[in-house]
Amino acid sequence: LLVISPGVPIDSPVVKAFEAAGVPVWGEVELAYAFDKGKVLAITGTNGKTTTTALVGQIVGAYHKDTFVVGNIGNPYTTEVLKSNKDSYTVAEISSFQLETIKEFHPAASAITNITEDHLNRHHTMEEYIRVKECITENQTMDDLCVMNYEDEILRPFGEKLMAEKKVQVMYFSSLRALKDGIYYQDGEIRIAKNGETELLSRTDDLKLLGLHNFE
């Protein structure tokens, strides 16, 4: 087994040589996941994933004592995973570099904040960057959830494709319009809609957050 850091390109000659010799190549996320006894909530995206990971960690941690927040935000996944148990939750910030080396990584819930052009020096093409970001859903099933930005022109059709193929449950979010299915911001309220029926989740005045992007 070869475990590489996210900074090592998977197309480097050293990595290719190990793969050619039949040696499995994992990243830190895949290694940690192999030892995780609880549930994983994984967050990726070009922008906002660190803030989103922090906020989700605070929310989940308010309800579950054994909640671990990992990634670029603080502690690496591998330093926290041995504390996990069957009731624990790991909220993980996952970069595109880390998604390149997943094999069995299977989050119970994932989120993709947005996808815009980035890291093309590593991924070479926008198509490859998109493919890698979308890998966060690779092992998810209809028992799982993927949350994504309805206003993102790349993510919206990807979500529709996932739902059409019954690959994973998809929940969209939007700050620009009311959704028939999903979570949206409108007139100072955050609401959730299902089949056209809506329910108030929170009023933004009750939240200690600055900026519409944080309500998203």
Kindly label every feature range from the protein language model:
Residues 6-150, 154-169, 184-185:
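Phosphate-binding loop of NTP-binding sites
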Residues 124-127, 164-216:
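Adenine nucleotide phosphate-binding catalytic loops in nucleotide-utilizing enzymes
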